UniProtKB/Swiss-Prot annotation:
One of its GO terms (biological process) is reductive pentose-phosphate cycle. HAMAP family: RuBisCO_L_type1 (MF_01338). This is Ribulose bisphosphate carboxylase large chain. Its cofactor is Mg(2+). It is an enzyme of class 4 (lyase). The modification N6-carboxylysine is found at residue 191. The modification N6,N6,N6-trimethyllysine is found at residue 4. The disulfide bond which can form in the large chain dimeric partners within the hexadecamer appears to be associated with oxidative stress and protein turnover. Pfam families: RuBisCO_large, RuBisCO_large_N. One of its GO terms (molecular function) is monooxygenase activity. Its EC number is 4.1.1.39. The active site is at residues 165, 284.
Amino acid sequence: VGFKAGVKDYKLTYYTPEYKTKDTDILAAFRVTPQPGVPPEEAGAAVAAESSTGTWTTVWTDGLTSLDRYKGRCYHIETVTGEENQFIVYVAYPLDLFEEGSVTNMFTSIVGDVFGFKALRALRLEDLRIPPAYSKTFQGPPHGIQVERDKLNKYGRPLLGCTIKPKLGLSAKNYGRAVYECLRGGLDFTKDDENVNSQPFMRWRDRFLFCAEALYKAQAETGEIKGHYLNATAGTCEEMIKRAVFARELGVPIVMHDYLTGGFTANTTLSYYCRDNGLLLHIHRAMHAVIDRQKNHGIHFRVLAKALRMSGGDHIHSGIVVGKLEGERDITLGFVDLLRDDLVEEDRSRGIYFTQDWVSLPGVLPVASGGIHVWHMPALTEIFGDDSVLQFGGGTLGHPWGNAPGAVANRVALEACVQARNEGRDLAREGNEIIREASKWSPELAAACEVWKEIKFEFEAMDTL
């Protein structure tokens, strides 16, 4: 029998509502906005086709393989309530379509060409179900939450961080001084800003040396293990690894990477190096809002978070529910759970479309940062719990008396909140009172409370269900 040339509807091949999903399938939930006149079944089938085996016309080489075995299948469609002409389309992909241990390949398939497809007005990948058969091919985070706590010898509370500001323009020596003051004051970590790489005013090697000196000095004086996220992000993978090697030689505990601008291949490479050499890996998500901020087009951050857990990172910025950078509470807590927990049940009220079983892949600490200060501490402690990093940049360095008192204020506020919680007090209701009580015996905290008592960033969150 000759093959039948020509263009035929995608839905004839790729829309299979009777399909029963397999445990090994990768499942995707897309928010699809078809062009006017395109039925949802055709749009859903087109997404399945273009992100797996299909092309725009029938080709004779289709006969050389088993399409039934390899094709993506649109198996369910539901309308989005309250939105006109918007659908959630569920697609199942056979596992054979993906290279083992490669987030890069997974994304190239699932969100490659299909987002430019003309029959769709807009397309957003809302969630992915990664089957254990696939997640087991990834190393995941270099160390994970428990190993990190054991390395740092810090338990029972969130960790405190601070991004050194101004983010660009300081010399290496002045930068190191700021790091020392913050760590000496009581923070656990300080952080390179995501755009600090190796610029003319401060080359990476000088920064690494002065930060290591600051770290060891603060450690000796406080008796606590300290860290500074040394940003190893670079223009090439080789240069990035060179920086990570130097960090290891200095004996520091943690390095950092910008995983979206650096790319998943570079990130996974660095993650492997970090596990092999005992370095923790802090991940910044610079550029994420370009991809995830539009409600009807792009990729939701919960997918980028899952991808990071597979690719590898011990911390990742996860947005906050208070402060200057947006995050909607239930949705944020949904992907915070996806980062930390072993098994996360489907829960549409939190934007989780699939039950995700990570089969003991190490967890990632969510990092809350962006416009937060001491008055937010009770809310942050309650919302994020112990397994998190709370990062105050301006909220430390903006203290009227300087960096070290700023760090003291944050540490006192945190310890007060943790103690109050452990005594059974309600942080949501009594938060301000707890901070006020603590500030009576901490002049540093009292000064911080005075400076930031009126500051609010109140805008509508873009990211709603």
